[in-house]
């Protein structure tokens, strides 16, 4: 008897979970949530780019250990500080426009990194500050995702958007090989 009640209770819980999952996807805007995830993912790839490339860059420019550490830390610190600026932009311009402005800076920075002269340490630090704009993606992606979902689903929405942190692993896996292949 108790066993049957337990099975019945478990079945009802599974049904509720299925309903919750279904209602989550109906409650918000999945394309915006996926866009927030990809925005976050790509931003994280760019933000941490100097870390996976540090060995190659430090060998090419004969950087000291301290210089290499500063080079890797600069985009992280800049990103942390630029989140405040990006947050203000998000509040005034809304996430889409603020994100577009951020991406223009990021694309310009990547173009300079690829085609420009980064033969001096100061140039690397400047690039690091500019790449920090990608680190401000928190202030764009999270409001973009959460504004489309009611409070009871915001944890799930933010979890999905926040999974864009996986961009750090993707950068570590692919950036060194791409740098060797394309410069």
Task: Please provide the spans of the model-predicted regions.
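Helix-loop-helix hairpin linking two adjacent transmembrane segments in secondary transporters
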Residues: 161-183
């Amino acid at each position: 008897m108790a066993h049957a009640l337990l099975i019945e209770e478990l079945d009802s819980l599974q049904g509720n979970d299925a309903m919750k999952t279904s209602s989550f996807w109906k409650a918000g805007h999945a394309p915006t949530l996926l866009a927030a995830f990809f925005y976050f993912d790509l931003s994280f790839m760019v933000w941490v780019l100097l870390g996976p490339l540090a060995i190659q860059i430090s060998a090419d420019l004969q950087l000291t250990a301290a210089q290499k550490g500063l080079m890797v830390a600069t985009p992280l610190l800049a990103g942390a500080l630029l989140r405040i600026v990006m947050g203000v932009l998000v509040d005034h311009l809304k996430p889409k426009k603020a994100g577009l402005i951020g991406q223009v800076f990021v694309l310009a920075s990547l173009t300079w990194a690829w085609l420009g002269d980064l033969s001096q340490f100061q140039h690397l630090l400047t690039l690091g500050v500019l790449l920090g704009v990608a680190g401000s993606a928190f202030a764009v992606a999270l409001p973009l995702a959460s504004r489309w979902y009611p409070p009871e689903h915001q944890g799930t929405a933010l979890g999905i958007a926040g999974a864009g942190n996986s961009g750090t692993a993707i950068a570590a896996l692919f950036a060194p090989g791409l740098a060797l292949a394309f410069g």
